[in-house]
C-alpha cells in the first residue's frame, strides 16, 4: 500500500506520511522536526524583535531596514539568540547609546566579542568559583575581549633554490 508522497513545507524534501512522523500545517504537511525547529526559530525571532522595539522606544524603528539586516545576518550563519545577546552586550553591558538611523548594523562587528563574553560568564569553573569561595578568589570580567584568529597567508612563498 503506497501513499502519495508529500513535500515538507519548511525543508522542501518529499516524504511519505506513513513512514515518517508529520504535522499538518494548514493545507500542507511538514516533518515533525522541521515544524518544531520552525516554531523555535519563530519564538527566537519574536524575542529579538521585541527587544529591538524596547531599545528604540518611544521611537518606532525602521523595520524595513532592520528586517533586511536580520535576514542577511541569519544567512551568514548568526542565530537570532546570538543577535539578541550581541545587542544586549553592546547596549547594556558596554553602555552604548541607540542611534535611530543605524538599525542593528553593529551586530556583525560585536558578535564574536559578545559570544566570548557570555561564554566566559557561563563558564562552569567561574560559576563554581563564585559559589564556593567568592572571598578568596577575585573574579573579574574584563570589558574588552581580544579574539585572535589565525589567517593563512594569501600568497605562496617563493623558493629561489634550484
Label for each model-derived stretch:
Residues 5-8, 28:
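Residues immediately within or flanking Cys/His clusters that coordinate Zn2+
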Residues 8-11, 34:
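Disulfide-bonded cysteines in secreted/extracellular proteins and peptides
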Residues 12-16, 38:
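Cys/His-rich microdomains that often coordinate metals
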Residues 16-24:
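Canonical RING-type zinc finger of E3 ubiquitin-protein ligases
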Residues 23-78, 144-162:
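Long, charged low-complexity interaction segments
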Residues 85-143:
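Short, cationic/aromatic linear interface patches
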Amino acid at each position: 500500500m503506497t501513499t502519495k508522497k508529500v513535500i515538507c513545507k519548511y525543508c522542501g524534501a518529499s516524504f511519505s506520511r506513513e513512514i515518517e512522523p508529520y504535522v499538518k500545517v494548514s493545507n500542507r504537511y511538514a516533518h515533525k522536526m522541521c515544524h518544531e525547529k520552525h516554531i523555535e526559530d519563530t519564538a527566537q525571532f519574536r524575542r529579538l524583535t521585541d527587544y529591538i522595539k524596547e531599545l528604540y522606544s518611544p521611537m518606532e524603528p525602521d523595520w524595513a531596514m532592520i528586517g533586511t539586516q536580520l535576514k542577511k545576518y541569519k544567512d551568514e550563519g548568526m542565530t537570532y539568540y546570538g543577535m539578541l545577546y550581541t545587542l544586549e552586550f553592546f547596549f547594556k553591558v558596554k553602555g552604548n547609546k541607540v542611534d535611530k538611523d543605524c538599525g542593528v548594523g553593529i551586530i556583525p562587528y560585536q558578535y564574536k566579542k559578545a559570544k566570548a563574553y557570555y561564554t566566559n560568564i557561563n563558564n562552569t569553573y567561574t560559576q563554581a568559583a563564585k559559589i564556593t569561595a567568592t572571598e578568596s578568589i577575585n573574579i573579574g570580567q574584563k570589558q574588552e575581549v581580544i579574539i585572535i584568529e589565525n589567517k593563512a597567508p594569501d600568497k605562496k612563498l617563493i623558493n629561489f633554490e634550484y
